[in-house]
Amino acid sequence: MKKNLINKNNILLLIIILFGAILRLYNLNWDNGYFLHPDERLYINNSNISIPKTLEEFLSPDSSLNPNMFYYGPLPLYLYKISNSYIFTSMSLLITSRLVSALFSIFTIPLIFLIGRKIFSEKVGLLSALIFTLSIESIQYAHFNTTESILVFLLSLILFLSIKVVKENNFFYFIPLGILLGFSYAAKITGLVFVIMPSLSFLILFFSKENLKKIFFWGFIFLILTAITGVILAPYQIFDLSHFLREQEYMQGVTYGKYKPPFTIIYEGSIPYLFPLIQILPFTFGFLAFPLSLIGLIIIIKKYINQKNIYLLFLIIFPLLYFSWAGNWYAKYARYYILLFPFLAIWAGVALSKLKNIYLLLLIPLLIINALFFFRIYMFPNTRVTASHWIYQNISSNKIIASEHWDDPLPLSRSDNDQVKTFTSIQLAVYDPDSKEKIEKLAIDLSISDYFIISSRRVYFSIFQNPQTYPQTIHFYQLLFNGKLGFEKIKEFSFYPFFVSDNFADETFQSYDHPPVLIFQNNKKFSPEQIINLISKTN
């Protein structure tokens, strides 16, 4: 037994897992505890939950266990709270929750290996595990206490067990599959789409002329376990149904473009399918790994056509169905496509496995370097944190600082090492549709401001995507950036992990952990009338 465990492939897998752990666990306090990811604030702000004292209280929508937040499922919050209360008691809830997220991402690595080995070979399994380990967004989201790492783990485990059902002809795997689908639903309502993989197992068994009574019996067990687990882990999606449906309707409306809050209009005019293929996945999965994955997909499809290997369907059906759905959404957040990563990793692993060792020795270091370039983000202070320190050191107290609404104003709250200073903050309502009143108010606010600080490209990139709504606001930004509005750019804090600007990537890939911060000083002090005249000179 010991001899079987200590072999070259197992040692390589252990090295890959340890390397993945370093990439995911290093500097979980990357933002100095400022909650710079808005979804993290959502979890922390709703973390004041506790066990109800009575059954009546438990069943009530007003229960102390109800997080009163249904944009995401409650499972991650419950996991974070339990871990912080009983395991990692010396840590803050923020760091504990990031640690749990990172651990789920680490646990996914051996699962990718097992899937690759189950369908292909140990070589494919190892290469696939390495590709996933080095995937940029899996490293990034391991540093956030959001649902993504948990969902990717559950997806990978469901994929693995769905394959085992068919390969081993073992129906008992439908028991954990039903439970895991319930977990996925409790993590995020999107997790219900993972049912595609167990359903594929059922279909394969059905057409293989298995005992139909047996198939329907286990199908019933699977559905019952999914429902029971989902209700147990997310009870208030039933007990507080109206609240749940209301928030889900809003979130679905945002996703499909029925509702367009300011933080989504950056996707106005983005081309379905091409946007994630060009402006998301090369950055989030890897500049080299992503094209390798597409080559691997072609190899897998050809292999299925030639050999009719039914197990390959598990690597084709879900990702293509999911992408055909999510790639057409109005809001194309980078995180939506992280559910493709287990499949992309295996596709890329298949492509790499076809190469001679000499080419692997050339490509693998390039894949590692790409990941390490991004990893540097967590080796240096966050740009917003650094900018805030600079503000406390270099801007006099009582100055008026303007910022954009719907983005994080700077400076952040003072740290122990910063000087004690107070500033007056003004938020410019640039997202309001252009009107005479808006431009007049904008001009007044700018005229009295000593500084204007842009803490990410989120707002002005959104504005530039909507010229019909914001012709004058676009001209305002053009004047600002060209130094013609009386404001001079005196400082920029940016960290581009790949040494060149990643502004072409989806905004959400950049704005949380490495946003460019621009600081403008009002040197000429134009009057409101002068500013209005400048902004109004546009067609």
Regions found by a protein language model. Give the residues of each.
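Transmembrane-lumen/periplasm boundary regions of multi-pass, lipid-linked membrane glycan transferases
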Residues: 43-54, 69-74, 78-79, 85, ...
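Short acidic/glycine- and proline-prone juxtamembrane loop motifs at membrane-interface regions
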Residues: 137, 143-150, 333
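Membrane-interface transmembrane helices that cradle and orient dolichyl/undecaprenyl
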Residues: 119, 158-174, 184, 206-209, ...
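Specific aromatic-rich, kink-prone transmembrane helix
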Residues: 111-115, 150-167, 176-181, 343-347
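C-terminal luminal/periplasmic domains and tails of membrane-associated envelope-modifying transferases
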Residues: 373-376, 384-539
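Transmembrane-helix motifs of polytopic, lipid-linked glycan transferases
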Residues: 95-119, 157, 161, 295-298
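Transmembrane-helix signature of polytopic, membrane-embedded enzymes
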Residues: 16-17, 91-92, 112-134, 167, ...
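Short helix- or helix-capping micro-motifs
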Residues: 20-23, 128-133, 160, 181, ...
